UniProtKB/Swiss-Prot annotation:
CDD domains: AdoMet_MTases. GO terms for cellular component: cytosol. This is Ribosomal RNA small subunit methyltransferase B. Its main location: cytoplasm. Keywords: Cytoplasm, Methyltransferase, Ribosome biogenesis, RNA-binding, rRNA processing, S-adenosyl-L-methionine, Transferase.
Amino acid sequence: MNLRALAAKAIFDVLEKGVSLSVALPEQQKHLASGKDKALLAELCYGVMRTLPQIEKRTAECLAKPLKGKQRIIHQLLIVGCYQLYFTRIPSHAAISETAEACRQLKFEGMVKVVNGVLRNIQRQLTPLSNESETLSYNTPGWLIKRLKTAYPGNWQEIIQQSHERPPMWLRNNRLSQSRDEYLAALDKLEIDASAGLSDDAILLAAPKDVATLPLFLEGAASVQDGAAQWAATLLAPQANELILDACAAPGGKSCHLLELEPSIKLIAVDFDAKRLERVQQNLDRLSLKAEVIHGDAANIDSWWQGEQFDRILLDAPCSATGVIRRHPDIKWLRKNHDIEELAELQRQILDHCWKWLKPGGTLLYATCSILPQENRDQISAFLARTADAKLDTLVQQASSQDIGWQITPGQHNMDGFYYARLLKATH
């Protein structure tokens, strides 16, 4: 099937059915043989998600009436066409003819003239895209802009801008295979430009690469993991032979990093999502690491764990993922304002429950890939107020010792947006 038709189908699944792009895109990429075509399909889908309000408005201006019902797929096809005309180097005639052909392949023969007409109209007048509202100016939903303005009055615009940048590719060196310097030297030998990141195992690539081209990647010499996420294992600081729980473990990057740091630990990796849990096992297998992988609910540990309390717990809590919009731009359209309070309540339940399963004297690291205070600073502040045996351990990375935890904003040191708070349980 024509590449533009596949793009329209993936975007339809995201915007009309609420499927995440990380699921919808690979589903359509299966139909393409060449890596080049798969990359173009990804560029079209991600590009549309980044610029959706502006290109939807521009497309609507050239339509006599909105497309509804079964014709929504053609609406998605038109915005794919509009994106090509404004944001890619694809020659206009090719973009238009290929998009019209996609309309045929989607079995809407009667709409081909409409698609042709709308796209030719746009091409004739490539006027600047509308910025008459903040949603249009920033290609971001109004509710999220409002929350960011409140949380970051001095730099909310920069945070939004960083969230639209194309994300860099980070690697985590597997210290059980080689030192970071040795892996950097191996990359250099292959003329792959890379530099050391802030945390001990982090490597930042100057340009994204296919993992199959990286030295000994498939044999477990390194993993793909953003620089911000790599702090989790370092901050939890596993010690020899400890019993450690990774409470929301999928897809398993942090579990694997914990085992790389301290192979003698007994690690229990748990997740509520059975499908994503398969990825945890795949990652462990590639890196030749061992953990007990359990399908279970971190808010109901009693139902799947009859062992003793844990020495350390990593709680990478379910969250809005507002810190990783640059990697997952569909989050802007899948998340809704009311989700934030619902997520904060879920986080509260999981945090309180995990705390009961932490040994006296133990450490719990609370983490999210959110940049919203309701899920981070406010969440931990409320937890400390209601939990007598909990104490916040100041992290050296914090901007100030008065801060509650460490908030990383998108693009800071080239990292994703992330939050960490390290909590210590009293010994008495």
